[in-house]
From Swiss-Prot:
This is Peptide PGLa-B2. One of its GO terms (biological process) is defense response to fungus. It comes from the Eukaryota. Signal peptide: none annotated. Has antimicrobial activity against Gram-negative bacterium E.coli ATCC 25922 (MIC=25 uM), Gram-positive bacterium S.auerus ATCC 25923 (MIC=50 uM) and against fungus C.albicans ATCC 90028 (MIC=25 uM). Has some hemolytic activity against human erythrocytes at high concentration. Keywords: Amidation, Antibiotic, Antimicrobial, Cytolysis, Fungicide, Hemolysis, Secreted. The modification Leucine amide is found at L21. The keyword Magnesium does not apply. GO terms for cellular component: extracellular region. Its main location: secreted.
Length: 21
């Protein structure tokens, strides 16, 4: 539920951050 949602958001941010690098 919430943990899964938070993990998805973190993954999205991480992907964007890696893309910015």
């Amino acid at each position: 539920g919430m943990a899964s949602k938070a993990g998805s958001i973190v993954g999205k941010i991480a992907k964007i951050a890696l893309g910015a690098l």
